[in-house]
C-alpha cells in the first residue's frame, strides 16, 4: 500500500507562492488573529518603530482602535476582518459591548458568567439641568435624573485644576457667566466707554435737575 509520506514531499509545506507576500502585507492573510502584540510597535510612529514593518509576525494595534469596545463577532469567533476590524479583538472587561438581554429585561440569565457589560438603566437617564443649578420645580416627579453631588470648594473659589475629572460638581451660574467672562481689550474698552457715558449722562441729569430746582426756588421767592 502506498503511504502518504512517499507521495508528499516533507518540504512542501514550507513552499510559498509569489502572491503570498502581497496578501500578507495588504490583508494580513494567514496570520493568527490571537497572536501577541508587538512590543516594538509604536502607534504614534508606525513607520519607524518596528524593524519588521508589515512583515512582523506579531500584531500591530493602531491608536485609532485603543478606545473602542470589544468586537461582538470576535467573541463568537465569527469576525472576518481580523486586524482591519474597527473594534478590539481582545478580552477587556472594561470595553465589552453592552448586554442586550440585561438592557431590555433588567436582569441577565448568564450572571455572573456573562462577558457582556451590564449597564444600569438609571445611568442612561439624562441629568436634570435645573437640579444641577440648585432647584428643580418638578421634584420627585421629574423625568430626568437628580444627581446629588457636593460642590467643589476649589471651583467655588474660582478655579479647579482637575477640571471635568473632578469628583465634585462644578455648578454653572449662568446669570453671572457673562460678567465673569474674560473679554478682549476692544470689548472691555467699549464697555468702559458705555459705563462712562452712562455716568456722564446721569451726572448731567442730576445737574440739570439741581439747576431747575434752584430756578424754581428763585421764582417762588420772587423780588
Swiss-Prot record:
ZnF region ranges: C3H1-type: 32-63, 65-92, 93-121, 122-149, 151-173
Superkingdom as given in the UniProt entry: Eukaryota
InterPro entries recorded: CPSF4/Yth1, Znf_CCCH, Znf_CCCH_sf
Location of the protein in the cell: Nucleus
Region (Disordered): 184-223
UniProt main location, coarse: nucleus
Membrane listed as a keyword: no
Any GO CC annotation of this UniProt entry: cytosol
Gene3D superfamilies: 3.30.1370.210, Zinc finger, CCCH-type
GO process annotations (BP): mRNA processing
Keyword Metal-binding found: yes
Keywords: Metal-binding, mRNA processing, Nucleus, Repeat, RNA-binding, Zinc, Zinc-finger
Biased composition (Basic and acidic residues): 184-204
GO terms assigned for molecular function: RNA binding; zinc ion binding
Family assignment from sequence similarity: Belongs to the CPSF4/YTH1 family.
Chain's role: Component of the cleavage factor I (CF I) involved in pre-mRNA 3'-end processing.
Protein name: mRNA 3'-end-processing protein YTH1
Organism annotation: Debaryomyces hansenii (strain ATCC 36239 / CBS 767 / BCRC 21394 / JCM 1990 / NBRC 0083 / IGC 2968) (Yeast)
Gene that specifies this protein: YTH1
Amino acid at each position: 500500500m502506498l503511504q502518504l509520506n512517499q507521495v508528499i514531499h516533507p518540504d512542501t509545506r514550507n513552499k510559498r507562492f509569489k502572491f503570498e507576500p502581497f496578501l500578507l502585507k495588504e490583508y494580513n492573510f494567514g496570520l493568527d488573529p490571537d497572536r501577541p502584540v508587538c512590543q516594538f510597535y509604536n502607534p504614534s510612529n508606525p513607520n519607524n518603530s518596528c524593524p519588521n514593518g508589515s512583515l512582523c509576525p506579531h500584531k500591530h494595534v493602531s491608536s485609532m482602535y485603543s478606545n473602542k469596545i470589544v468586537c461582538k463577532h470576535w467573541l463568537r469567533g465569527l469576525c472576518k476582518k481580523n486586524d482591519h476590524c474597527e473594534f478590539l479583538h481582545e478580552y477587556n472587561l472594561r470595553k465589552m459591548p453592552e448586554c442586550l438581554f440585561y438592557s431590555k429585561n433588567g436582569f441577565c440569565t448568564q450572571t455572573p458568567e456573562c462577558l457582556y457589560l451590564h449597564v444600569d438603566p438609571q445611568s442612561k437617564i439624562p441629568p436634570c439641568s435645573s437640579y444641577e443649578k440648585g432647584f428643580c420645580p418638578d421634584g420627585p416627579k421629574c423625568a430626568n435624573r437628580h444627581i446629588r453631588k457636593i460642590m467643589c470648594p476649589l471651583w467655588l473659589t474660582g478655579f479647579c485644576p482637575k477640571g471635568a475629572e473632578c469628583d465634585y460638581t462644578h455648578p454653572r451660574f449662568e446669570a453671572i457667566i457673562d460678567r465673569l467672562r474674560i473679554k478682549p481689550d476692544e470689548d472691555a474698552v467699549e464697555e468702559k466707554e458705555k459705563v462712562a457715558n452712562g455716568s456722564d449722562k446721569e451726572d448731567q441729569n442730576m445737574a440739570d435737575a439741581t439747576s431747575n430746582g434752584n430756578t424754581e426756588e428763585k421764582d417762588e421767592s420772587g423780588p
